[in-house]
Design a protein with these regions (language model features):
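Hydrophobic "anchor" residues on beta-strands that sit immediately upstream
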Residues: 20, 128-129
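Alpha-helix/helix-capping structural signal
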Residues: 26-27, 53, 135, 154
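Acidic, metal-associated active-site segment
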Residues: 105-125
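Short linear capping/connector segments at secondary-structure termini
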Residues: 93-99
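Acidic, PIN/NYN-like endoribonuclease modules and their adjacent C-terminal/linker elements
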Residues: 124-128, 134-214
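PIN/NYN-family metal-dependent endoribonuclease catalytic core
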Residues: 20, 31-33, 37-67
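PIN-domain endoribonuclease scaffold, especially VapC-family toxins
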Residues: 52-93, 172-210
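Metal-dependent nucleic-acid phosphoesterase active-site entry motif
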Residues: 1-35
Length: 214
């Protein structure tokens, strides 16, 4: 299992690597963080995957009043995600959930199992389980596997360091937002407030700006 242990040291992204990401629902709920990750996937700088339970959780939460979305708009978002990334949906991970009994929060066992299934599906490739809740999906739960739970800001920062094109992709992304318009400075402030401060700083530097956290 030396390879598994080695995968959890050093940078999260290697030069020339297209990281394999399994996304927890909580990183798909914030509009702009979701846009950042999915635009990078569309540019083939990362590969994204999720499970049916993850999408169900996204749907359930986006219908809460604080997100200001209608059932129709949520359905369209999920339909667009499925259409844009037809290979992202991972099925058949339920049998792996018992492996995480007592290791993760019971409600997040399906996320852990999905990430492990993804690693095995790709012949033991490292998988970054991108989550905003490391406490419920601790690294210890994935000992002797090639799955590493990481916060979104950490993987985005390392990806930018290895792939300067990240800055160009996100610059182009901003052109889609019109009502309201979102400037570079706006996005940096949003990322900073979304626990992605180090990434916001690095992205601001790439754009020749300073993030709001500096």
């Amino acid at each position: 299992m030396a390879a598994a242990r080695a995968a959890k040291t050093g940078p999260l992204v290697s030069p020339g690597q297209v990281p394999l990401l399994y996304l927890d629902a909580n990183v798909l709920l914030p509009e702009y963080l979701r846009a950042v990750i999915l635009d990078l996937a569309d540019a083939e700088l990362v590969r994204v995957h999720w499970g049916e339970q993850v999408l169900a959780e996204v749907q359930r939460n986006l219908l809460k009043p604080k997100f200001g979305m209608t059932p129709a708009s949520v359905d369209k978002l999920l339909r667009d995600m499925r259409n844009a990334f037809p290979d992202a949906l991972l099925l058949g991970s339920e049998a792996l959930e018992p492996e995480f009994e007592g290791k993760t929060d019971p409600k997040d066992a399906h996320v852990a199992a999905g990430a492990l299934k993804l690693s095995r599906r790709y012949g033991g490739q490292p998988v970054l389980l991108v989550t905003g809740n490391i406490r419920h999906l601790p690294e210890l739960a994935f000992r002797d596997t090639l799955v590493q739970p990481v916060r979104p800001g950490a993987v985005l920062k390392d990806l930018l360091a290895m792939q300067p094109a990240v800055a160009d992709v996100l610059d182009a992304m901003l052109q889609r937002f019109e009502h309201p318009a979102v400037s570079r400075e706006d996005l940096l402030a949003i990322l900073d407030a979304s626990n992605c401060r180090a990434f916001a700083t690095a992205l601001g530097n790439a754009w020749g700006l300073a993030s709001s956290g500096d």
